[in-house]
A protein has these predicted regions:
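Short, hydrophobic alpha-helix immediately C-terminal to the catalytic nucleophile
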Residues: 70, 137-141, 351
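Flexible "cap/lid" subdomain of the alpha/beta-hydrolase fold that forms the substrate-access gate
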Residues: 26-31, 43, 91-127, 131-331
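Catalytic active-site module of serine/aspartate enzymes centered on a nucleophile-bearing elbow/loop
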Residues: 328-363
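An N-terminal hydrophobic leader/cap segment in hydrolases
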Residues: 2-4, 8, 16-34
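Active-site helix-initiating loop/hinge in glycosyltransferases
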Residues: 61, 104, 130, 345-346
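Conserved Rossmann-like nucleotide-binding pocket used by diverse enzymes
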Residues: 32, 55-58, 84, 127, ...
Length: 363
């Protein structure tokens, strides 16, 4: 069951210490850096808010780091939430195994289970953006007692697994005829599978330019148009024959200069091989989804936040949201006038959407 909600808007001690990375107001608890290690993995995470406050864990996607959530952390920490934002596996200060199979969703969910135990294992609100959404959804499906509610941003929930074979059947074939665009807007996903080394090399040719070129605000003029992501194979890569991103200034409305520098520093360390390996595990991710209790049905309250101008993941002009609507017993949907990078494009509006849903859901 789904309902449209809220309308459209314009822990524990850790080895890493408490390095202050900033706060926007005097009444906001300092955002601090921590590191947690288990025998199998190390997770670097940011935290803010009272240690005994209700727990909110925010999971970033590709190609992001935990710092992407700064605005949301500061807002909810100032309201008494204990907010935690890890660098996910392969990113930033967290472990980056060499094997591609180490980035299967079951491994990443295991990371979050260990982190959750380290934080005290109180049932949490799990918030995910982009690839963080499949992680949050899978954790709720496989470990329901750990989740009070789930917020999925940009990428909807797929009970059978967020994998290319499950995405292609949902493509809008009026916009993407199968004979011209067999993988539709997901062509970039296919290209990562078929041209992995080239993709990594192209992204790493100029890290600041790559990140600046990826982080652009959504454009309402793109609605109903073929997405550039559908042309990656035809163009021989995201950047074509240049094999590197064009010189592009970062958008200060998305990342402050200080935070963009931190993002670049993180990718100078990790590169793109580990973060792109998340795309290489369709078979394992589908198999993992099949092991979820009750077919992956979610009984917790779920909020999905859709970007009206998201050329890849918008659920209003395609069938992309159908599996989520069928699988979530208590689903709320809100739409924001933005593209894919909702936590950055609509910082305050996203906070308000989550806040309203928390209140309405009694969370």
């Amino acid at each position: 069951m789904s309902k449209t909600a809220f309308g459209s808007g314009s822990g524990s001690g850790a080895a890493g210490g408490t390095v202050v990375v900033g706060a926007s107001a005097d009444n906001v608890p300092n955002l601090t850096v921590h590191t947690f290690s288990s025998p199998r993995h190390t997770t670097r995470y940011l935290a803010a808010g009272p240690a005994d406050g209700p727990l909110m864990i925010l999971l970033h996607g590709w190609p992001e780091i935990g710092l992407m959530w700064r605005a949301q952390i500061e807002a909810f920490a100032s309201e008494g939430w204990r907010c935690v934002a890890p660098d996910m596996r392969g990113y930033g200060g967290s472990s980056a195994p060499a094997a591609s199979e180490a980035y299967a969703l079951n491994e990443i969910v295991h990371d979050m289970v260990e982190l959750h135990d380290h934080l005290g294992a109180r049932p949490a609100i799990w918030v995910g953006h982009d690839w963080g959404s499949p992680v949050a959804g899978a954790l709720a499906a496989h470990h329901g007692a750990r989740s009070r509610g789930v917020v999925l941003i940009s990428v909807p929930y797929f009970p059978e697994g967020f994998a290319l074979p499950n995405l292609v059947p949902l493509i809008d074939r009026q916009l993407y005829p199968a004979d011209q665009y067999p993988d539709g807007q997901w062509d970039y996903f296919r290209f990562y599978l078929t041209h992995f080394s080239q993709t990594v090399s192209d992204f790493e040719a100029d890290t600041p330019a790559t990140l600046a070129s990826l982080y652009r605000r959504g454009n309402p003029a793109s609605v109903g148009q073929v997405s550039p992501s559908a042309l990656i194979t035809k163009n021989g890569g995201r950047y074509g024959s240049a094999h590197r991103a064009p010189a592009t200034p970062p958008d200060p409305a998305l990342w402050t200069p200080i935070d963009f520098d931190a993002l670049v520093d993180a990718f100078d360390v990790s590169g793109f091989r580990s973060v792109n390996a998340w795309y290489l595990n369709d078979t394992a991710n589908i198999a993992y989804a099949r092991t979820a209790p009750k077919g992956g049905q979610l009984r917790q309250p779920v909020l999905f936040v859709n970007g009206d101008w998201d050329a890849i993941c918008d659920i209003n002009r395609s069938r992309l949201g159908e599996p989520m609507r069928s699988a979530c017993a208590d689903l709320s949907i809100t739409n924001l006038p933005a593209g894919h990078w909702l936590p950055l494009e609509r910082k305050a509006e996203l906070v308000q959407a989550i806040r309203a849903w928390l209140k309405t859901s009694g969370l």
